[in-house]
C-alpha cells in the first residue's frame, strides 16, 4: 500500500511539473486596451508620445504579467493588477516621476550627472541601473 501511494505521489508530481513547464513562457500578443487600466493610465501619462509596438500577456501557473515595448525600445512590465514592476529604457531615461522620491533625492546627491536607465520594483526592494552601468539596490521602506 505504501508503495502504491508513493508511486501515485510521484506520478502527480511529474504531471504538475510537466504542466508548469508547458504553461511557462506563454506570451500572447494583446491590444493595448486589454492591459489593466492602471497600466494604460501610466502609459498615457508618461509615454503618450511613444507608440506601443507590442503588448503581451504572459500567463503562468500562479501569476500573470503584461509586457509592453514602445517605439523607442523602452520595455515595461506590469503585474496582473497593472502595477509597474520593471522599466528598461534602451534610449533615453526613466521618467523622473516613476522613481520614488527618496531614491531621486539619493541619486541627486550622490550621482547628479547620471540618468536612470532601468528600475525594477520587487516585493521588498528597488533595483536601479544608472547610465554608467552602476547597479544600486534600495529597500522599499
Segments and roles (model prediction):
Residues 1-27:
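Bacterial Sec-dependent N-terminal signal peptides
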Residues 25-141:
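Interaction-mediating elements
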Amino acid at each position: 500500500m505504501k508503495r502504491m501511494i508513493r508511486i501515485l505521489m510521484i506520478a502527480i508530481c511529474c504531471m504538475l511539473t510537466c504542466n508548469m513547464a508547458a504553461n511557462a513562457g506563454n506570451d500572447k500578443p494583446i491590444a493595448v486596451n486589454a492591459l489593466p487600466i492602471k497600466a494604460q493610465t501610466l502609459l498615457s501619462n508618461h509615454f503618450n508620445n511613444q507608440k506601443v509596438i507590442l503588448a503581451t500577456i504572459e500567463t503562468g501557473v500562479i501569476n500573470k504579467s503584461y509586457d509592453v515595448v514602445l517605439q523607442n525600445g523602452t520595455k515595461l512590465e506590469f503585474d496582473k493588477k497593472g502595477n509597474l514592476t520593471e522599466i528598461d529604457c534602451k534610449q533615453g531615461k526613466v521618467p523622473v516621476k516613476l522613481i520614488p522620491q527618496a531614491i531621486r533625492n539619493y541619486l541627486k546627491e550622490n550621482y547628479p550627472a547620471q540618468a536612470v536607465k532601468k528600475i525594477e520594483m520587487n516585493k521588498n526592494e528597488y533595483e536601479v541601473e544608472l547610465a554608467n552601468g552602476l547597479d544600486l539596490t534600495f529597500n522599499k521602506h
